[in-house]
Regions:
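Acidic, low-complexity intrinsically disordered segments
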Residues: 49-90
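Amphipathic, interaction-prone secondary-structure segments
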Residues: 1-46
Length: 90
């Protein structure tokens, strides 16, 4: 499943079920108009929070990798709303 607007692109990757039976989902977020790596995130449905954000190892040390975290903090609420919508309509 894919969501795309003028600012970013969110792609559903997979669902994970951990040992506590919590449902969590892995998504990627690609912020447009900036040359930054794609941010991966894990969203916990039961807690309604993003529990983890990370960049693939191959991109960790490029000059703009730290910028993606700061930029994501500016759009995090909007991304969570879209993720909830995507999960509800799967």
């Amino acid at each position: 499943m894919l969501f795309e607007n003028g600012k970013f692109k969110i792609e559903y990757i997979e669902e994970c079920i951990d040992h506590d039976a919590n449902r969590s989902f892995i998504f990627t977020v690609d912020i447009k108009d900036f040359d930054t790596p794609t941010l991966n995130l894990v969203y916990d449905l039961e807690e309604d929070i993003i529990v983890k954000t990370y960049i693939d190892e191959q991109f960790e040390n490029i000059p703009k990798s730290h910028v993606v975290y700061k930029m994501f903090s500016l759009i995090e609420y909007e991304v969570i709303e879209i993720i909830r919508f995507m999960i509800d309509h799967m």
